[in-house]
Amino acid sequence: MTTTDDPRADPCFEEAEDAILEGDRTFTPGTAAAALSHRTFRTVYVGAFVSNIGTWMQNVVLGALAYDLTGSGVFVGVIMFAQLGPLLLLSMVGGMLADSLDRKKLLIALTVEQALCSVLLALVVLGDDPSKVLLVAVTLAVGIGNALYAPTFSAVLPMLVPRIDMPGAISLNSVQMNASRVVGPVIGSFVFARFGASWVFLGNALSYAAIISVLLTVRLPRPPTTGTQGLHRLLEGVRYARNDPIVWRCLVVIFTFSLFCLPFVTQLPKIAGDSLGIAPKSTGYGVLYAMFGLGAVVGALSIGTVFSSASKPRLTRYGLVAFAVFLTVFGALRLSLPAYPVIFCVGAVYFAVITSLTTVLQRDLDDAVRGKVMALWIMGFGGTVPFGGLGGGVLMERFGITPVLLVSAVVAVGLSFYARLDRPAGAAAPTAALAD
């Protein structure tokens, strides 16, 4: 194995360590506050948050628009498949690019591509009867850009802080992702209901300027390299994961959880309309989605604050059981009012699980393969969701909403028994050499 210099020796990383080098750090290592003390991380974090608000404006309106146009849960699943399906097919390519190309230039190029596609979406839906084929095609183009962008960004963010502060950085990244799920749907549903979907998509295109401007002004750490090429490089992440039982279990859990437990996310417009009496093209639907996002913010933030010193493997197992309980309750509801607090609880335990699981996965990863392993994570976290959503839509049409969500809950309980993620005392994580 050959490597370049450790990225933490890079000048931009020295800048990120100001709080430590000046000797006046008062934050507990590993907490969210400690992660925010690093300037480069803080700058990228804010830019990503603003951009993700626009992304979630678009995400929630795409699903609502699909249901509004057709009244079909299957077409909602098709749109979500176009949006998220590329994560399963292209994330490994994105991870390989993240570990071999200039990450800053790559992120900027992919952000510009997604912004242009959002403008195209706005043009496609201008008329009263937009082409469903074009809607799916342009949504697919957005999904392809995101599939290449996501593993790169996921690999960059933890490298902007020392390893000791990585849990806080991961927790904060989950917070900004889900805080944008609160703000974005509220703004998006309001604009959709009053001005139409085109203005939502244009707003998202403008929001990309926030992350582009940040990326133009900061320096990012250079990744090490393992020196491998071609298909061998593409499969490095898989080989590394197979040699680390903890990483492998994390990936099995996220793939299974996303495929079988998250159809409710993509089918939320159908659940809201059919079970709860909440029209997808309404502010009430935006508030429902925002409550889910707000719960996710609380759950993610709790991992870097209240539960910062708690065992993340144990939190993962307990969280899976709690998720099953709240999802079962949500699936049984037929009134809109109690749905808001219940989906808040679903969101809280959902992202407490995701954040704990991500922390376990990332804490011992070799930086030389971080992008490729995180590509596998993105494949599981986002790439399997559209398959579950599409299948969930078909099953909900045939058997109803409650039975499908009950099956999801049973799978979550089963995963709680499988998710034994504690590394044996004294056992070291594999190095990138084992991926060769």
Which residue ranges define each predicted feature?
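Alpha-helical transmembrane-bundle signature of multi-pass membrane transport and export proteins
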Residues: 2-436
